[in-house]
């Protein structure tokens, strides 16, 4: 999206987390849609998640000996919070960033697809006061059996929309 020039208002921030085996550009239809409706969107590229990642040349099979699922479950929500922190630094009024004074980091939404939906739920567990809403599209569950989507939800107050397909068996 084009820079907003001398905007009088600040734009809310959306942090997007992709699904397993994907990367940030895999969901351009969603992130561009959000950006075209007045949101500043930051999309994660989570380490070790894309099918095309080759760090040491080894083959990693889901759930296999070299699977990093548990580590990714711990890291992905932290990646999302890290992006909020980064934008907060970039958006500081008076700074020299193109985002200075243009992004309202007190109005953040988290969104994600599949494993990114799990990351969104897990990031909500931190109860970051900057996060005002979340959208989880076909969220996966924790394979380690702990954390997001595995705890009592009665004390949660952040509005969340969960989108699922009735035929989704994953």
Functional labels for PLM-detected ranges:
Residues 88, 117-128:
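Short glycine-enriched nucleophile-adjacent loop
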Residues 25-63, 70-73, 77:
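Active-site machinery of serine-nucleophile hydrolases
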Residues 12-19, 45, 138, 164-165:
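The conserved beta1-alpha1 loop
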